[in-house]
């Protein structure tokens, strides 16, 4: 019924002969925010449907020529009929006419553009109608909204035809001009829903171009030129490595830790043998005559200023005081013996214990005498090193280097200490031999040594050395052993067996 009503109104418009020329310009409302792309207006598979009433109205106006132009700038025409300037309320268009327009608008994809852009106005111009089919309106206003709706439909059909012609051979790269590759990527992230399928392909191609350009820039950094020979540079490096280093030509000196007070001794040719003030523990106290020693802070060692390396020698030690908790370990020690430990603590010293008469070496106690010794006893110490000079290790070699004295590192191929054949250490108690304590000892310089122990807040454990020439209990019979010489006859041998001068010139070599 609605279609029939619309046809009657069109016939009334055709009976009006007064309208010979009519130019109708229709402007779309300014609400849409984008321009419709012609390539997306019409679906090829489903052409827009048109009602029968519209087809009849078009047939009656067969000779009418309608020109529709899409203006990008300002619209110019003889008569502009916006919806606001019409005095009469626009007639309600039939649903049959509005249906195809609505369906077409739903299918459109809108690209966001500036709303104020003037290219969104459409102008429809009609030159003239034929005299056989004049159009009249039932109202006084000759421009009826029915004509507007018909013109809108005709204009959309013409636009669809133009879109089909342009879609036949569209330029691929002119769909959207890319100012720069990065702007496309940013726009795609900001408006992912509005990107058309064709634009997505363009964006993908742009991304691939960017990736390829990045790869090319990276590849340029790598110097893969096959025409450049790399052997010349390596050869120069090798030649530099082969050149002798002037610093390497100098003598190499390996600096090693030097023992405490290596170039210092308290023995002089004018003095007789006595206890050393240098080679002793700090907690060991020595008397003014440097023959009596005592300690109350645990086992600490003190040794004499001179030692023997060859021959048979003898000295005595008298236990002056042990106290309630005092103990002693007496014996012989080399120059490498630990001063902060008792005699017999390591392999460089040999001791005789007071508690049970055990002998001690390398911190191992072994049964030796029938009983120990106590206060007032005199212990005799005997050592025999036949031809010990040939088995003694070489003394350390000192050199002067840049104003300082250094000890040369020992040779890696140096042989271990040699055992002196027939060597022996024996202990005597009040002139009675306790038997051979140690035999076949290694060669070296042996010094008389003693170590004392006493608990704190008690009187010191005191012992007194006697180097001769007169002894309190000198043995009358040594049981077939070589007769020893008193230690006071040991000549001055300087520091570490080397004779020292005022300038210590012997150490400079």
Curated annotation (Swiss-Prot):
Ubiquitous. Highest expression in pollen and seeds. Expressed in the embryo and the suspensor cells. Detected in cotyledons, roots, leaf hydathodes, sepals, anthers and pollen grains. Strongly expressed in root tips, shoot apices, vascular tissues, developing embryos and endosperms. Disruption phenotype: Embryo lethality when homozygous. Eearly flowering. Slightly lower ATX1 occupancy at the 5'-end regions of the target genes. Decreased TATA-binding protein (TBP) levels lower Ser5P Pol II levels near the transcription start sites (TSSs) of target genes and of Pol II at the genes 3'-ends thus affecting the transition from transcription initiation to transcription elongation. Significantly reduced trimethylated 'Lys-4' of histone H3 (H3K4me3) levels at the 5'-ends of WRKY70 and LTP7 genes leading to reduced transcript accumulation. InterPro entries: ASH2, B30.2/SPRY, B30.2/SPRY_sf, ConA-like_dom_sf, SPRY_dom. Trithorax-group gene homolog required for early embryogenesis. Required for the expression of FLC and FLC homologs and represses flowering. Required for proper leaf growth and development. Part of COMPASS-like complexes responsible for H3K4 trimethylation, but not for di- or mono-methylation of histone H3 'Lys-4'. Binds to target loci chromatin, increasing H3K4 trimethylation and causing activation of the gene. Involved in the transition from transcription initiation to transcription elongation. One of its GO terms (molecular function) is chromatin DNA binding. Residues 9-21 have a biased composition (Basic and acidic residues). It is found in: Nucleus. This is Protein TRAUCO. Keywords: Nucleus. Residues 231-240 have a biased composition (Basic residues). CDD domains: SPRY_Ash2 (cd12872). It comes from Arabidopsis thaliana (Mouse-ear cress). PROSITE patterns: B302_SPRY (PS50188). Residues 133-142 have a biased composition (Polar residues). Residues 70-81 have a biased composition (Low complexity). GO terms for cellular component: nucleus; Set1C/COMPASS complex. Part of a complex composed of TRO, RBL and WDR5A. Interacts with RBL, but not with WDR5A or WDR5B. This complex is formed during both vegetative and reproductive development.
């Amino acid at each position: 019924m609605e279609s029939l009503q619309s046809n009657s109104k069109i016939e009334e418009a055709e009976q009006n002969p007064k309208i010979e020329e009519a130019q109708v310009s229709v402007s779309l409302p300014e609400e849409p925010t984008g321009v419709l792309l012609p390539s997306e207006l019409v679906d090829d598979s489903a052409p827009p449907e048109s009602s029968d009433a519209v087809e009849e109205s078009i047939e009656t106006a067969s000779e009418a020529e309608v020109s529709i132009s899409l203006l990008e700038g300002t619209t110019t025409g003889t008569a502009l009929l916006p919806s606001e300037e019409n005095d009469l309320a626009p007639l309600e268009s039939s649903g049959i006419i509005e249906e195809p327009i609505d369906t077409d608008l739903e299918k459109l994809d809108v690209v966001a553009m500036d709303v104020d852009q003037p290219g969104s106005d459409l102008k429809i111009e009609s030159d003239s109608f034929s005299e056989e089919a004049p159009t009249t309106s039932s109202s006084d206003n000759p421009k009826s909204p029915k004509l507007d709706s018909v013109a809108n439909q005709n204009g959309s059909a013409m636009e669809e035809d133009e879109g089909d012609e342009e879609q036949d051979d569209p330029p691929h790269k002119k769909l959207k001009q890319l100012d720069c590759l990065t702007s496309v990527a940013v726009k795609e992230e900001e408006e992912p829903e509005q990107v058309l399928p064709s634009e997505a392909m363009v964006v993908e191609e742009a991304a691939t171009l960017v990736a390829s350009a990045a790869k090319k820039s990276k590849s340029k950094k790598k110097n893969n030129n096959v025409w450049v020979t790399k052997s010349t540079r390596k050869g120069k490096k090798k030649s530099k490595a082969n050149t002798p280093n002037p610093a390497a030509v100098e003598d190499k000196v390996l600096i090693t830790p030097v023992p405490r007070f290596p170039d210092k001794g308290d023995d002089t040719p004018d003095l007789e043998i006595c206890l050393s003030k240098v080679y002793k523990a700090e907690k060991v106290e020595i008397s003014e005559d440097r023959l009596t020693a005592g300690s109350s802070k645990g086992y600490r060692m003190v040794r004499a200023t001179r030692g023997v390396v060859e021959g048979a020698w003898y000295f005595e030690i008298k236990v002056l005081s042990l106290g309630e908790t005092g103990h002693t370990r007496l014996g012989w020690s080399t120059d490498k013996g630990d001063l902060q430990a008792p005699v017999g603590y390591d392999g460089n010293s040999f001791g005789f214990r007071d508690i049970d008469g055990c002998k001690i070496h390398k911190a191992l106690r072994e049964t030796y005498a029938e009983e120990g010794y106590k206060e007032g006893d005199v212990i005799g110490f005997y050592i025999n090193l036949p031809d010990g000079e040939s088995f003694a290790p070489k003394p350390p070699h000192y050199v002067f280097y840049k104003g300082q004295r250094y000890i040369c590192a020992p040779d890696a191929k140096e042989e271990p200490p040699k055992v002196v054949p027939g060597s022996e250490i024996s202990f005597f108690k009040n002139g009675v031999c306790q038997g051979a304590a140690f035999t076949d000892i290694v060669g070296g310089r042996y010094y008389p040594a003693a170590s004392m122990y006493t608990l704190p807040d008690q009187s010191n454990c005191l012992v007194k050395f006697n180097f001769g020439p007169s002894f309190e209990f000198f043995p009358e019979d040594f049981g077939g052993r070589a007769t020893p010489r008193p230690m006071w006859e040991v000549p001055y041998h300087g520091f570490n067996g080397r004779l020292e001068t005022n300038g210590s010139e012997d150490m400079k070599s």
